[in-house]
């Protein structure tokens, strides 16, 4: 507590035994998995989070949806690591409650693209880190994650950086950069955004990406 440091390790073990199955070359198998998270409150305004062999076993499962459209279903983030400080990286334009402006959702950074495939199945994350600084005027965040390769996707690095500046109590301008890199290629997206409270009943939410 005196160092404002929290270390949370974990160890998982599994034992499988197959009987009366001659097609299996190893009828008994024991596996171990270990990892953990580290949270360091560097100052009252800044926090560093580190994770390796990240375990998302406690995350709630997605509800079952029959999707008959050609678009992906938008599921909310449920993993604790990505829920922390999610509001800092969550810039975008969401549809209005009455859908008067259409149902389109524009979100440059979507954390569910990390560690999950398109069907919501987990892909192991080897390691990652996140730094967040918050003050009355400025907010800064950066996150870097390394995802293991799978049968359908090579190992991939994800990065997101965010800066926002508060203009008074109700207005804000900011920028966001996201990057994704693997052996198949890379892409980078830059975003500028702003929020302005024009009156008690009117507000302006803008974004250029």
What do these predicted ranges mean?
Residues 19-24, 62-66, 115, 152-154, ...:
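Outer-membrane beta-barrel translocator domains and adjoining extracellular loop/strand segments
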Residues 26-34, 123-127, 134, 154-159, ...:
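Residues that define the transmembrane beta-barrel architecture of outer-membrane proteins
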């Amino acid at each position: 507590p005196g160092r404002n440091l929290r270390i949370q390790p974990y160890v998982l073990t599994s034992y499988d035994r197959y009987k009366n199955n001659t097609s299996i070359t190893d009828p008994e198998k024991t596996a171990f998995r270990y990892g953990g998270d580290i949270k360091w409150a560097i100052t009252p305004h800044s926090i560093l989070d580190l994770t390796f062999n990240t375990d998302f076993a406690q995350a709630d499962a997605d509800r079952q949806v029959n999707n008959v459209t050609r678009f992906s279903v938008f599921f909310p983030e449920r993993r604790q690591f990505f829920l922390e400080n999610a509001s800092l990286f969550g810039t975008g334009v969401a549809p209005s409650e009455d859908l008067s402006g259409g149902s389109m959702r524009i979100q440059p950074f979507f954390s569910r693209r990390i560690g999950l495939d398109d069907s919501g199945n987990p892909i192991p994350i080897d390691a990652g880190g996140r730094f967040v600084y918050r003050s009355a005027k400025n907010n800064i965040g950066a996150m870097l994650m390394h995802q293991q390769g799978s049968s359908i996707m090579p190992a991939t690095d994800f990065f997101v950086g965010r800066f926002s500046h508060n203009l008074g109590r109700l207005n804000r301008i900011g920028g966001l950069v996201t990057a994704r890199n693997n052996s198949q290629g890379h892409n980078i997206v830059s975003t500028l955004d702003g929020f302005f409270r024009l009156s008690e009943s009117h507000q302006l939410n803008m974004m250029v990406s």
